[in-house]
Amino acid sequence: MGDDLVKVKICGITNEEDIAYISKKVHAVGVIVDVPVKTPRKISLDKAIELKKYVAPFTSLVTVLMPNSIEEVLEIYNALKPNAIQLHGFESLDFVKELNKLKNTGELNAHIIKVIHIPKDEEIDFKTLLNTAKEYEKYVEAILVDTKIESIKLEGKTHNWAVSKKLRESLEKPLILAGGLNKDNVLEAIKTVKPYAIDVSSSLEAYGGKKDLKKVDEFLEVIKKV
């Protein structure tokens, strides 16, 4: 993986085999911990702690959360010590500001990634979307754009990449592109958006929660063509 390549995070990892194999091939691996939605990719904090032992050196561990409180974030952070925390719900700006304060005091030593949900074209108010992203980016290390669907289900669906492109061009912090990426559309997505990184999960599965390692390899081979 050269520095000229878009960075890759593979998310929704649930087992030792997948994390040991995948973490040797990508920049970051993601675990979805105790989120309040039904998904086969959700694992417990204890399981996440166990999986961390299998992460390859120099690969970042990202914990995906939809927390109800600052205390919940700190509890998971202190137990797991991930490299980054991805806030994937509708966390308020004040909530993110509070986490940023904890970073400044040294209580939290992890990058913060905040998701921005991109709605269907007919529902997009780009000015509001951009203003929201600009407010959040003051307090985080990266903005992740994902497709907004009915009640967050952490399932991969694509959105209008032109919107993500405009956001990327307007923001100062790195933009991570997620939402329905697969080996057939990822080159077009990268060419259109030019993101700092991409985030992929469900398209690389054999079944819910279990990655198909052949699909992973095929996807990463496509990325090399960028």
Swiss-Prot record:
Residue ranges of the TM segments: none
GO biological-process terms attached to the record: L-tryptophan biosynthetic process
Pathway where it operates: Amino-acid biosynthesis; L-tryptophan biosynthesis; L-tryptophan from chorismate: step 3/5
tRNA-binding is among the record's keywords: no
Swiss-Prot/TrEMBL catalytic activity: N-(5-phospho-beta-D-ribosyl)anthranilate = 1-(2-carboxyphenylamino)-1-deoxy-D-ribulose 5-phosphate
EC numbers, comma separated: 5.3.1.24
GO MF annotations in UniProt: phosphoribosylanthranilate isomerase activity
Keywords assigned by UniProt, alphabetized: Amino-acid biosynthesis, Aromatic amino acid biosynthesis, Isomerase, Tryptophan biosynthesis
Cited InterPro entries: Aldolase_TIM, PRAI_dom, RibuloseP-bd_barrel, TrpF_fam
Record-stated family: Belongs to the TrpF family.
Protein's name according to its UniProt entry: N-(5'-phosphoribosyl)anthranilate isomerase
Native species: Methanocaldococcus jannaschii (strain ATCC 43067 / DSM 2661 / JAL-1 / JCM 10045 / NBRC 100440) (Methanococcus jannaschii)
Gene behind the chain: trpF
